[in-house]
């Protein structure tokens, strides 16, 4: 999964987030919350990696 986030265009992030918001529940399950947290982590990690790579390429 992480390699997908590192290489994917931004619209995939929104797709990911939208996918987790498809089923709204008043009390999110632990599993759902874990997946949500994992997806956010992967998104931020991927963005940071992309920024690092673009910075390295700019030099």
UniProtKB/Swiss-Prot annotation:
Task: Provide this UniProt record's keywords sorted from A to Z.
Answer: ATP synthesis, CF(0), Hydrogen ion transport, Ion transport, Membrane, Mitochondrion, Transmembrane, Transmembrane helix, Transport
Q: Where in the cell is it found?
A: Mitochondrion membrane
The protein's topology relative to the membrane is: Single-pass membrane protein
* Primary location recorded for the protein, binned into one broad class: mitochondrion
Which top-level group of life is the source organism from? Eukaryota
The family this protein is said to belong to? Belongs to the ATPase protein 8 family.
- Can you name this protein? ATP synthase protein 8
Species of provenance: Oenothera berteroana (Bertero's evening primrose)
């Amino acid at each position: 999964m992480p390699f997908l986030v590192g290489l994917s265009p931004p619209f995939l992030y929104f797709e990911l987030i939208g996918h987790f918001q498809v089923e709204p529940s008043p009390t999110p399950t632990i599993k759902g919350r874990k997946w949500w947290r994992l997806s956010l982590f992967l998104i931020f990690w991927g963005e940071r990696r992309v920024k690092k790579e673009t910075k390295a390429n700019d030099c």
